[in-house]
UniProtKB/Swiss-Prot annotation:
Membrane topology per record: Multi-pass membrane protein
Main location: membrane
Protein name: Lipoprotein signal peptidase
One GO CC term, this protein: plasma membrane
Reactions listed under catalytic activity: Release of signal peptides from bacterial membrane prolipoproteins. Hydrolyzes -Xaa-Yaa-Zaa-|-(S,diacylglyceryl)Cys-, in which Xaa is hydrophobic (preferably Leu), and Yaa (Ala or Ser) and Zaa (Gly or Ala) have small, neutral side chains
Pathway: Protein modification; lipoprotein biosynthesis (signal peptide cleavage)
BP GO terms, sorted: proteolysis
Catalytic machinery residues: 114, 130
TM annotation in the entry: 5-25, 61-81, 84-104, 125-145
Organism: Streptococcus pyogenes serotype M5 (strain Manfredo)
Amino acid sequence: MKKRLFVLSLILLVALDQLSKFWIVSHIALGEVKPFIPGIVSLTYLQNNGAAFSILQDQQWFFVVITVLVIGYAIYYLATHPHLNIWKQLALLLIISGGIGNFIDRLRLAYVIDMIHLDFVDFAIFNVADSYLTVGVILLVICLWKEEDYGN
């Protein structure tokens, strides 16, 4: 993926995350639940002071440090490995985008705005940036696993 396309995609993904959070705050009261696709997905405005599943509540300094380290390393890795396959680049793009999206919330608000609730399973409420992070990490693990299988 060319550098310009990567940066444009990064900006677009972070903007999509931030716009989704802005919309939720503007249209749904804190704690309110609105069915989006009944029985499948609801929108719920939640202020998360922790990480996934609300662990490590009120430890913002910890998340800021970890986020800076992970994003910094991902950018360093991209810069020093210019010939990565498209799947690894996509994985790192998603990880960086998700990290930046939640980082903006932590710096600006001291919490992360979550809003997506899966009605059909008992699962934590999450946001668009969390989705990027999850898909990015899964994709990166698959890439690394495949490399190990093929001895690369």
